Structures are given as structure tokens and as C-alpha cells.
Amino acid sequence: MTSEQETSQTNRLEQASPCAIATKGLTKTLGSTKVVDQVSLEVPTSSIYGFLGPNGSGKTTTIRMLLGLVAPDAGEVEILGASEPKHRQLRLSRVGAVVEGPGFYPYLSGFDNLKRFAQIAFPAQRKANPTIMKLSGAEISSRLEQVGLLDAKNKAYRAYSLGMKQRLAIAAALLWQRDLLVLDEPTNGLDPQGIVEVRDLLTSLNQSGLTIFISSHILSEVEIICSDVGIMRDGRLMFQGSTKAFRSSFGEEFIVETADPGLAKSVLLQFGFAEPDSIQIQAKRLTATLTTDEIERVVAALVNGGVGIRAVARSSPSLEDAFVALTGRSGHAR
């Protein structure tokens, strides 16, 4: 089969798949410990997917298997629609990744670092995909512009802020055309300004059609930018779906401000809109987990029941609240 035929076949596979990453029963044992156990990921194309889990949950090993750095003991990996090893290698040439801390030369400029990186990486890129060409200086400058570093292209790497260094690493991962970007802790160690810079960059890249897979422990950032999440615990995938669905799965609270919360409770129980143990009353506020999504019916029943309503609100748990409820771990995910 010629390289053009291989490219055509993997393109057809990609078009048939709604997922940029799909695994089935992915399993890996290190020593006597099963660190990844029957993990089946589905990362929607064009999504920003947050991959979360406590320390030792198997995230890093999973990422290494996705990128072909570690061989699984069992299971299947499909990247950009290609599952067979030969085709997957070709598709991996369309995947950019920043898994370890970026290794750049401190006294070289951002431009010269990317130029050097492109020279070193080109043979492997060309071997995986014969259609890939060497990059010109203008193309390297274009990548720097893409990550907002064009004005700093001649500044030495050692003079870059942490946020700038991370953006340069992302530029290196995007030197050639990519359909998928895999990032391990992209905002780790950054100050608030650096976090905002990287967040804005990832949002912009995603809007251009790039699928982004992020492993992160900063849950507040994941909640802001990720459309989908996967939650790992003890090597198993405990949840996978939209960020909104994950939060909602742990209950959405219905809040009523009223002068008579006792009457409001009676009405909710009368119509079966809430279970008794889900209702809490504090001063003039009633909070309940409803058994229905039809808020209009609930409000109408309260009004018809004589409840004087001052305010009504709905509140979903934060991503961190839901994460703690699922994993039993407080603080940062790892």
C-alpha cells in the first residue's frame, strides 16, 4: 500500500469516527499493581476534554499508552479514527503533545528554540507521515504568532515568564498540522496571569477546530474551559461525559426565598417534588433536591399553595464538589 493510499484510508477512518480518542478495555499492570483497569475513553472530536483523578489513579500511564509511549497489556486504542498500529502511527503524526516539562535552550531565543526543535523532530515526523515538509522561518514565526509570542520571538527563553514558556511548548507541539493536542498539567506552577494566558490560548485553538485533551489538577480551570471530563480512580474510569452532566449527576439544588419555608416544604412534599430528607430550611430560605426538572410546575404549585415567593434559584454543585463526592478526595485532583 502506498503512503497516499494509507493516508486516504486513515482519513476515511477518521471521518467515520465521532471521537478523536477512543479506547476499549485499556489495561496496564506495573509489577503487581493494575494501574489502568478496563478504561474505555470517548473523547469527542473538537472538544476540550479534562482528564482528572487523584494521585496514582492511572492518568499518566493512560496518556502514555494513548501516545504510544507505553504498550498496553490489553485493550484497543483508536486515535483520530485509526486503530491498526500502522495507521495509528500515521495519525499520531497529527497529534501534538506536551507531557513532560518542555526542554528548551535557555540562552536561545524563542524563535531559535522552535527552529532547533523543528530540525530535530523532522526526521521522525517525516517517517510517520511522508507528506510532512520542513518548516520555513515564516512558518515558525506563524506558530509563534498563533500562541501570542511573535513580539517576543527574539527574546531569550530564560527571560520568558512561566506562562510564555508554556505557550512556547504548545507552539512546539503545533509546529506541524495537528488535529489533537494532548497536554499534561498545562497550567501547573503558573501564576494567575499565566493561567489566564494559557486558558485563552487553548480556548482559541479549540475554536479553530482542534481537539484538546488535558490532564489537570486545577479543577476551577477545568470547569471553565472543558466541555467534557473523564474521572479516574484506582485505575478505573468512574465517570465520562459532559462537564455539565457530571455536576448535575450529583444533584441540582432548588432554592426558595420565602417568609414561610415550612409551608413551602409542605407543598413540595404534597406534590412529590422532593423527598423529605432532601429539604433543608435556614431562616427564610428553603433548599431542596427536586425529583423533576419542570421548575415552572414547582413554582406554580408553590404559588397556588399560598407560598409568598421572594426569589427562586437553581444551583448545581461545582466541579470540585462533584469530584470530591465521586472520589472521596478533597483539595486538588492529581
Question: What feature does the model see in each segment?
Answer:
Residues 1-27, 329-334:
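ABC-family P-loop ATPase nucleotide-binding domain
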Residues 237-242, 270-274:
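Short amphipathic beta-strand starts and helix->beta connectors
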Residues 244-248:
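Short acidic-hydrophobic catalytic motif
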Residues 18-23, 28-214, 219-233, 239:
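ABC transporter nucleotide-binding domains
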Residues 230, 325-328:
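Short low-complexity, flexible loop/linker segments enriched in glycine and/or proline
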Residues 252-326, 334:
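Short, charged/small-residue-rich alpha-helical element at the C-terminal edge
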Residues 45, 122, 151, 260, ...:
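Non-catalytic surface loops within mature trypsin-like serine protease
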